[in-house]
């Protein structure tokens, strides 16, 4: 029997074929789940619909997660289509490019609010809207990054947002524990996604990660999707409120390994 046989999963944040959310959708489908996906905006629709069709995914909905009415509308459609769901994946993060370069203290008030709303509150809003639809024993997963706990030049306000997202994960895990629903986060290494390309000097960060991580390998979207599969399957039935690092061990390092002269 496949790990997600008979499970119903809804995945938010598919943008293109390089998205972490898209990798999750593929892995979950291959693991036996019935999958639905959501995207943001008309431009992305043209990219996402063909991807969804390629794996036989019929539930494809647009959702502006900055609007509660959009979130609630997708929840209503999901209830009509699925009845109940077992898995909710939140793979959404955004900050204006202008906020992801230069000193952090130059973060604008509007930029701070935007990053927190899209990257953090959206997870809370989705959890609240889908709570009535979640089966007992279900799972919610979000995506974070090491910049939540360690300074990452140019990551700036997104680091603050990811720290808040991780705290939100723990509070949601407490709230949903009474319903036997698990809530966890995955902290992946840098990946060449659409969102990552907005971070200033990302190429340097990407190379430095590979050099410093104990495994000396960058992370792929499939690596992250496989971790999500574990967290959303019964294999992790007693795991909640955790931040699972999928980063080739980068998070354990204090200083880079000395390079022989």
Listing of model-derived features with the role each one plays in the protein:
Residues 2-38:
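Canonical Rossmann dinucleotide-binding motif of NAD(H)/NADP(H)-dependent dehydrogenases/reductases
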Residues 11, 89, 141, 183-186, ...:
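Hydrophobic structural elements of the Rossmann-like NAD(P)H-binding subdomain
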Residues 13-20, 93-128, 136-178, 190-192, ...:
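Catalytic loop of short-chain dehydrogenase/reductase
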Residues 29, 83, 134-135, 174-179, ...:
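A short hydrophobic alpha-helix cap/turn motif
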Residues 49, 178, 188-213, 253-261:
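A glycine/serine/threonine-rich, flexible loop-to-helix segment
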Residues 52, 63, 67-72, 76-81, ...:
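Conserved mid-core segment of classical short-chain dehydrogenase/reductases
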Residues 75, 123, 127, 169-170, ...:
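Short-chain dehydrogenase/reductase
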Residues 121, 185, 204-239, 244-248:
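C-terminal helical subdomain
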């Amino acid at each position: 029997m496949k790990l997600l046989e008979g499970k119903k999963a809804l995945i938010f944040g598919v943008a293109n074929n390089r998205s972490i959310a898209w990798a999750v959708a593929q892995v979950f489908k291959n693991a036996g789940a019935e999958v639905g996906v959501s995207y943001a905006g008309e431009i992305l629709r043209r990219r996402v619909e063909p991807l969804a069709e390629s794996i036989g995914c019929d539930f494809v909905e647009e959702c502006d997660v900055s609007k509660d009415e959009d979130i609630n509308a997708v929840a209503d459609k999901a209830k009509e289509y699925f009845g109940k769901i077992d898995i909710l994946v939140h793979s959404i993060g955004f900050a204006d490019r202008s906020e992801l370069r230069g000193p952090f203290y130059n973060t604008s008030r509007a930029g701070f609010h935007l990053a927190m709303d899209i990257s953090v509150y959206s997870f809370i809003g989705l959890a609240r809207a889908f709570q009535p639809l979640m089966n007992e024993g279900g799972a919610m997963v979000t995506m974070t990054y090491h910049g939540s706990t360690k300074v990452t030049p140019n990551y700036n306000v997104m680091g603050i947002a990811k720290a808040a997202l991780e705290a939100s994960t723990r509070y949601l895990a407490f709230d949903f524990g009474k319903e036997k629903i698990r809530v966890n986060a995955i902290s992946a290494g840098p990946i060449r996604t659409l969102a990552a390309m907005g971070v200033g000097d990302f190429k340097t960060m990407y190379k430095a990660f590979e050099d410093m991580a104990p495994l000396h390998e960058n992370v792929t979207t499939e690596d992250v999707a496989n971790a999500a599969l574990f967290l959303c399957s019964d294999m992790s039935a007693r795991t909640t409120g955790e931040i699972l690092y999928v980063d080739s061990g980068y998070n354990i390092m204090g200083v880079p390994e000395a390079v022989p002269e």
